[in-house]
Curated annotation (Swiss-Prot):
Member of the two-component regulatory system NatK/NatR that positively regulates the expression of the natAB operon. Acts by binding directly to the promoter of natAB. The gene is natR. Keywords: Cytoplasm, DNA-binding, Phosphoprotein, Transcription, Transcription regulation, Two-component regulatory system. This is Transcriptional regulatory protein NatR. It is found in: Cytoplasm. GO terms for cellular component: cytosol; protein-DNA complex.
Amino acid sequence: MVKVGLVDDYRVDLEKLEAIVSRMQDVEIVFSTDSAKEAYRRVKNGDIDLLLADIEMPHMSGYELADLIKSHSLDVDVIFVTGHGGYAVHAFDLNVHDYIMKPYYADRLAASFDRYLKKKTETSLNGRILIKQKSEMHVLQKKDIIFAERTGRSTTIVTTAEEVQTYQTLNDIKGDLPEKDFLRSHRSFIINIHYIKHFSAYTKHSFTVSFEGTSKKAMITKQQLDYFQNYYF
């Protein structure tokens, strides 16, 4: 089921969009609003997978909204549905899924959703990571990794189900993990932001990190904690 948000300051266009999307299979409209600021609040809460947005809106444009989504590494795709063609080149700089011009037909929107669903399926197949050891290999679900710690020449990966040791470095592992979910919190740690429970001061420039799912703790520098607060909230 794809969870969708709709935002357009023009009520007639918003109602048309609602009518078309509500008839699609495996799609749930989570919210429909005329405010880009309200849409951004819902996006930050992790309420949706896909946002359909007009561009020219008061207070915050759809372009500004998509830019915030990208710059904060939020896991939401965007389809622009707009009457203005002049933003197309800049829109794709933001890696939006599609750019649909008004007036449009339902078939055009349905085709865009079909491409999105295909992309989503392909992406889900890439949700695993291969961790190498000297004599064996482990296949882990990325979403199950809580954190990884480098100690000496060994890296320990703590998951919701087990701990795995590997000779692979944090740099090797970080390259295979999505930036929107994993943060290099310290020279010795990579953490999954979705399992964070709280931070405790450790030194003037560092904090310990506690997680859901394990009693083990990681470290985060003050600089990276500031980054976490600014870019993930």
